[in-house]
């Protein structure tokens, strides 16, 4: 994929989802070319399909919840978190290998050894089940409160490609938390003063009708925000925000 209008970019953040169906070949090829010509890029990745595969192998059923505002997310308890960290490592290793084959040094940054995102734990979640709102406890996910970019700049100085999983350090020092990958990418882009944030997914994009790909909204501006928000559903709400 060639981004004709991004030919002059010097610094950017790209996020690739962890869901099945993503083709990494073109991303790795173009990002490798850009890094080799001196551009500074950060790659943020998800881990959902890898988590699903590990869960099935261990006969564990993933638990998904929906917030009252319509956001769908995976519920992560302490056991799930260890499994999710392993799943992210599998994806990171795959990416490191793919970029290495093209002569690019991709370096994963994992907390607590390398802290980029810092988050506040959301121990209690409000979820909607059967039309009712209830509270569930034991959640090991969080929302990002700050972002440290020293390690990323250090890797850029070495001509490397930093790779970030959707994991953050607990602001109270209690270990690692799962965070939303899209919001991780957005926080990183803001902290690094990136010229562009690109979020790649296995779906076409924002659709006026989720069942009709011909209704894809190819381009818009902030002036159309209210209209765009009306079209967003499920996880697309988070990507827009």
Where on the chain are the PLM-derived regions?
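Nucleotide/pyrophosphate-binding catalytic subdomain
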Residues: 1-241
